[in-house]
Regions:
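Basic- and hydrophobic-enriched, low-structure N-terminal and domain-boundary segments
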Residues: 1-43, 47-131
Length: 134
């Protein structure tokens, strides 16, 4: 994957609905000074914006973010070591209790789920650390 292009994910096979190994890359030279992302509820607008902003940060591209709903505040949360104790402050104690789990167990599950998901998409620790330091 070329470092000069934004990595937005991987192509999805239309027949199986599963990700392929083919990356979706975007040339930041095609960006203008403003962007608008529109779409139906649940169509991936926030996910696309997060990906674009993270990739911009990794390449030192500045951004001003207007986020009236607060969807993008989690951009500042980076846990490159994927340690359960890093996730624990963000676990809802009441939800954990209702699920019959301790906070520690819920944090361990969250850490494990994030680790598996990132690995599945080919995102390693070095990339997470670079984003944290961007």
């Amino acid at each position: 994957m070329a470092d000069s292009k934004f990595y937005l994910g991987r192509l999805v096979d239309a027949k199986t609905a599963k990700p392929t190994t083919n990356p979706v890359l975007y040339d930041p030279a095609d960006l203008t000074t403003h962007a608008v992302v529109t779409g139906m509820t649940g169509s991936g607008k926030t996910g696309l914006c997060v990906a674009l902003l993270e990739e911009a940060a990794l390449q030192g591209v500045p951004a001003i973010i207007i986020d009236p709903k607060g969807d993008l505040t989690n951009l500042l949360l980076h846990f490159p070591d994927l340690l359960p104790q890093d996730f624990q402050p963000w676990i809802d104690p009441e939800m954990a209790r209702r699920a019959g789990k301790t906070l520690e167990a819920a944090a361990d599950e969250a850490s494990s789920a994030w680790g598996s998901g990132l690995t599945e998409w080919g995102i390693g620790t070095e990339r997470l650390l670079a984003l944290k330091n961007a």
